[in-house]
Amino acid sequence: MKKCWSVLTDDMGSCYITHLGVAHIHHVFNGSRKKASEERGFLVPLHPTLHTYGPDSVHMKPNQGLDLRLKQECQRYYEEHYGTREEFIKEFGRSYL
């Protein structure tokens, strides 16, 4: 199993939001951009209710609420450390800011 890392947190064993010790690893940008999420560190540990099981989870409400917040945080990081907004859009399909 390869080691997961995140630009958002050093603690991959606890939920980024609740800090509880039960966490699923969420690819902030998924689908065809899943590999880019792994390469850029755009992974985040989330409690299962925030990841897939809750009514407001990132997979139940894509591009809204928490999912949008995480995408925006990652885009800001990208623009500060990796490249321009135009390069972000080329790599991840659109701007979330």
Spell out what each predicted region is:
Residues 43-69:
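Short Cys/His-centered divalent metal-binding micro-motifs
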Residues 24, 42-46, 74:
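Amphipathic alpha-helical interface surfaces
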Residues 20-24, 52-55:
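Short functional micro-motifs and their immediate structural scaffolds
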